[in-house]
Each structure stands twice: as structure tokens, then as C-alpha cells.
Swiss-Prot record:
Assigned GO CC terms: cytoplasm
UniProt gene name: rsmC
Record-given protein name: Ribosomal RNA small subunit methyltransferase C
Cellular compartment(s): Cytoplasm
Catalytic activity: guanosine(1207) in 16S rRNA + S-adenosyl-L-methionine = N(2)-methylguanosine(1207) in 16S rRNA + S-adenosyl-L-homocysteine + H(+)
InterPro entries: DNA_methylase_N6_adenine_CS (IPR002052), Mtase_sm_N (IPR013675), rRNA_ssu_MeTfrase_C (IPR023543), RsmC/RlmG (IPR046977), SAM-dependent_MTases_sf (IPR029063), Small_mtfrase_dom (IPR007848)
Enzyme Commission number(s): 2.1.1.172
Superkingdom: Bacteria
Entry keyword set: Cytoplasm, Methyltransferase, rRNA processing, S-adenosyl-L-methionine, Transferase
The protein's role, per its UniProt record: Specifically methylates the guanine in position 1207 of 16S rRNA in the 30S particle.
Species per Swiss-Prot/TrEMBL record: Shewanella sp. (strain W3-18-1)
Homology family: Belongs to the methyltransferase superfamily. RsmC family.
Length: 347
């Protein structure tokens, strides 16, 4: 089953006949595979690890699948070139110029850019967002509540440098000052949000192997290692830009941790002495409530004897019931009018 934006691309796939195609920021469907009906080859770069896992079982000599903030093994002077680059307009609008610059770096001269997105997702502002080295974006299709724009690479794009897309700032935490590196598209208030502040203000003393689930830009990781530098910390997220941000944050603070993608806890191994998180489930939708349930269930199985589990969550979400059902007991060490802190120690 193809998503609505992917269906719009299929409606317009004739322009890809025998093209070497790159798909950026694709969704959790098999659109890149479907394009092989007309394209000579397709490379797909997912920025969401779940989307990558959905597609990668179908990889073959004509379909290469990647996860990350950029294509791997590229010569910065001569990156690999494509006849067409397809960009799925990102939900985080500040990420769009990054994706357009990345696309331009991988297009042949006068190569085709296709940008698709849902009407409600900000794509209507595409013409203003396209850099000057692209021709003016032309609307090619309007269907399935989506828009498809086309353009061509007319000029020369600046070389991709990750440092051009990072904002670095100092953050005061209960553990002291830390430097945060935030890439475009990664959530940041440039101050300590209320939930994380509640978590860090009541940080337990941990030991051994600790997991930071949904690490984002690495705020919790850096604060944790500042206070408890002896920890063997692992940081996981599903978002490529978040993982790259976390690595930059740790480096800026002279800290080390294992940073890697994981869909839930599926890519973690073994048991942990501690699991800490401000989990990214804040919208109360059924889908995210199910992800939250899976996180609680899976993390309960991966706690060592005497292991500590502590998360902060919006108080209106049904965490109390989920945690009580899984752990059999529930401690709330602190709360405010918006957030609750949940704590459990494995016996």
C-alpha cells in the first residue's frame, strides 16, 4: 500500500524513464521499489529508521537502501550523481532547505527535482523555499490531498557541510552547563523544556550500562554523563538528524557514548542497569499510545536485577495504567501541572 504522496509520484513516473533516481526522506512504503518499473535504478535514503526497515528487505542490485542524514561513502568533491532526485517534503519544515541542498549536490547539471507532500504539511510554500540554484518550482500535479512540484538544477549548489546546518548553544541543567548541537529538523526550544527539567532535577544515581531512549539532540545524555561520567551510556533514536545531533553534542562536551538507530528497543541487545527517557509520545493518538505500551513492555524485559527505570511523560497520557500493568507497582517521585515522573526499580 502506497501513501498518498507516493501515489502522486506513481501518477507522474513517466518522467523517470530509464533514469538513475535518488529518493530522499521516503515514507514507510515500497515506492522506491515500484519506481523500478520505469527507472534504471533507485537509491533510497530514509531519515526515519522505521521507514528504512520497511524497505530494506526489498534491496537488490537496482535498489539500494540507506539510513542516515546523508548518503554513506561519498567523496565530498565528487558526490554520486543522479538524473532525478525525489524529495518527500518533511514534517519539520526547517529540514526542507537541507534536503534541497542535499538533492542539488547529487543532481547532474539540469537534473530533475521532484518534491511531493501533503497540502496540510507546508509544501504550498515550496516555491519560496527552493534555493536560487534551482529553476522556479512548477506545480505538476494536485491529487490525493497532495501537491507535486518539479524543478531543474540550473546553478551550482554549495558543497554539503553538516556544520552549516547546526545551531550550538549553552544549556543550564541541574547537572551544570552543557553545550547542545542541534541540527535542522530536530526539536529544540533552546532552553530546558519542563519535562526534561523535571527528569534531570530528580536524576537517580545509576551504574553500569544505561540506555537513553529517544535521545534527540543529546540533552539528557550530556547532563547524565556530566554528573555520572563513569556510565556506559547507549543513546537510541529513530531519527537520523537526532542521532547526528546527539553525536555532535557528546563530542562538543568531550563525552563518549554508543549512539545508534533503533525502532523501539528492537535493535538493542542484552539488559541494562538503567533506562532513562523523556519519550517522544506526546500527542495521545492511539498509534503513539501503542508505541508507548511496547516501550514499557520491552524495557521491563531488558532491566537487570536492581535496574532503575525512570521516565517523564505528559500527565494526561495513560502511562500510570500501562506501567502499573507491566511493573505491578508505580512510584511518582515528582510531578508538576503538566508532567509526571515515573520510577521503578527491578527487584
Amino acid at each position: 500500500m502506497l501513501t498518498n504522496p507516493s501515489q502522486v509520484i506513481i501518477r507522474n513516473q513517466d518522467s523517470l524513464n530509464q533514469h538513475k533516481v535518488l529518493v530522499l526522506n521516503h515514507e514507510a512504503d515500497l515506492l522506491p521499489k515500484a519506481l523500478l518499473d520505469v527507472a534504471a535504478s533507485v537509491d533510497a535514503l530514509a531519515l526515519d529508521y522505521h521507514h528504512y526497515l520497511h524497505l530494506v528487505p526489498h534491496a537488490n542490485s537496482k535498489l539500494r537502501c540507506y539510513f542516515g542524514h546523508e548518503l554513506p561513502h561519498q567523496d565530498p568533491i565528487k558526490p554520486e550523481k543522479y538524473d532525478t532526485v525525489i524529495v518527500y517534503f518533511p514534517k519539520a519544515k526547517p529540514l526542507a532547505p537541507y534536503l534541497f541542498t542535499l538533492a542539488a549536490n547529487h543532481l547532474v547539471p539540469n537534473g530533475q527535482l521532484l518534491v511531493v507532500g501533503e497540502n496540510k504539511g507546508g509544501i504550498k510554500s515550496l516555491v519560496k523555499l527552493l534555493p536560487e540554484y534551482f529553476a522556479t518550482g512548477m506545480k505538476l500535479d494536485n491529487a490525493r490531498h497532495c501537491l507535486l512540484f518539479g524543478s531543474n538544477l540550473e546553478g551550482r549548489a554549495p558543497a554539503m557541510k553538516l556544520s552549516d546546518w547546526v545551531s550550538q548553544y549553552q544549556l543550564s541543567t541541574p547537572q551544570g552547563e552543557i553545550s547542545i548541537c542541534n541540527l535542522v529538523g530536530v526539536f529544540s526550544e533552546k532552553r530546558l523544556d519542563q519535562g526534561t527539567e523535571l527528569l534531570l532535577s530528580h536524576l537517580p544515581t545509576l551504574s553500569g550500562r544505561v540506555l537513553d531512549f529517544g535521545c534527540g539532540a543529546g540533552v539528557i545524555a550530556a547532563a547524565l554523563l556530566k554528573a555520572q561520567p563513569h556510565l556506559s551510556l547507549e543513546c537510541i533514536d529513530i531519527n537520523a538528524m537526532a542521532l547526528a545531533s546527539c553525536e555532535l553534542t557528546l563530542a562538543a562536551n568531550g563525552m563518549t557514548a554508543k549512539v545508534y538507530p533503533s525502532d523501539g528497543l528492537a535493535q538493542t541487545t542484552g539488559k541494562f542497569n538503567g533506562i532513562i527517557s523523556n519519550p517522544p509520545f506526546h500527542d495521545g493518538l492511539t498509534s503513539t499510545t501503542n508505541i508507548a505500551k511496547n516501550f514499557v513492555t520491552d524495557s521491563a524485559k531488558q532491566l537487570q536485577h536492581n535496574g532503575i527505570w525512570q521516565i517523564v511523560a505528559n500527565r494526561h497520557l495513560p502511562y500510570s495504567d500501562i506501567i502499573a500493568a507491566e511493573f505491578g507497582q508505580l512510584t511518582v517521585p515528582a510531578e508538576n501541572n503538566k508532567y509526571k515522573l515515573y520510577y521503578f526499580q527491578q527487584q
